[in-house]
Amino acid sequence: MMGGKSSKSKKNVEFGSPSTPVQIKINSEYTEHLSSYERACSEDPKLESFDSALHERTNRVINKLASGVEIKSLSFDSLREVTQCLLDMNQDVVKVILQDKEDIWNNQDLFSLVNLYFESTAKTMDFCSELENCLNRARRSQVIIQFAVNQFEEENEDKENRKYEKTLEELKRFKVAGEPFTKEFFALFDLVYKQQVMMLEELHKLKRKLDKRLRNIKTWRRVSNMVFVTAFVSVLIFSVVAAAVAAPPVVAAIAGALAVPVGSVGKWCNTLWTKYEKVVRGQKEIITSIRIGTYISVKEMDNISILVRKVEVEIESLLKKAEFAITEEKEVRLAIDEIKKKLDVFTETIEELGEHAGKYCSDVTKARTVILQRIIRYPAGSPKDEAPWTEMM
């Protein structure tokens, strides 16, 4: 491998005639990078292929230059060979970079999705308010019908006057109260539910994109190695060229000037790769939070829908019984007996719906808080800094 041959010859790499020796000194920092490059080549077939091509090019150009060094003269063909070699090496690196040219630090998909989430949850909060209003109306209806039953018990004890006037009055109030769930409630329910389902679909698509980006971290690691070894080989080639056309002091100046970018490029690329991974994982943390919150929201809305329908069925039955009692005053006793049978189920359903509604609205609020925490910390924060989602439920 190019890295292997470079590191093995690090103690005495010389080009030029005996009277004008040129030596490239590879310090411990380069040794570390080259060793890392060797390991990467053994683990990555694509990088190993790049290394083989680079090795072949480098040998060809150095052999070409060696003949010029012996006579202290370089032909235009030799210089053209050098230029073409450097261009080819750089082009190989550029090709790899362009394969994944997306701007990872400005993820417009994520930005749009987070905005959509907060717009959606704002509508969800409106829905929660409307749901609470409907529940209050249902509770008032439950109180009225319970009071009507109590009135019936009192009036039924008066054997001389069993017209059940107060009972009928309460039943009329119950009838006037009507259905607790309005058209606005169902319109909001449909809107929010569709938004939540759409959100889950978009989250699934974005998660797959982010998973692909995490897999591409291997590509970026390959790029960083390519950039480093390309710059390193460029120093070797330029040093040979300098040996053929200049005095040793000039060679030393050229090699020294190039040593800084070569030494720093490995660190820079590694920093780039690390930042890439951190940013993508930060984006995945945000997406995971939104997915959990949205999934729970959809499930709770399914439960709420079932319970709302159950309340509707129960109250519709009670309204029919009340209507029967009002129109057929002689049948008040029969109507109240039927109402009593339905009342307990109606009350339990309202209580159950209230519990689900409270949990749902609480979950939405907590989900917004968790996601805001992640956005504030993104991409520098750590998931450990936050309360786990399960603890906040």
UniProtKB/Swiss-Prot annotation:
InterPro entries: DUF677 (IPR007749). The chain crosses the membrane at residues 226-246, 249-269. It comes from the Eukaryota. The keyword Transmembrane applies. GO terms for cellular component: membrane; peroxisome. Its main location: membrane. The keyword Membrane applies. Residues 1-20 are annotated as: Disordered. It is found in: Membrane. Residues 149-222, 299-356 form a coiled coil. It is a multi-pass membrane protein. Keywords: Coiled coil, Membrane, Transmembrane, Transmembrane helix. Disulfide bonds: none annotated. Belongs to the UPF0496 family. PANTHER family: UPF0496 PLANT-LIKE PROTEIN, UPF0496 PROTEIN 3-RELATED. This is UPF0496 protein At2g18630. The lineage of its organism: Eukaryota, Viridiplantae, Streptophyta, Embryophyta, Tracheophyta.
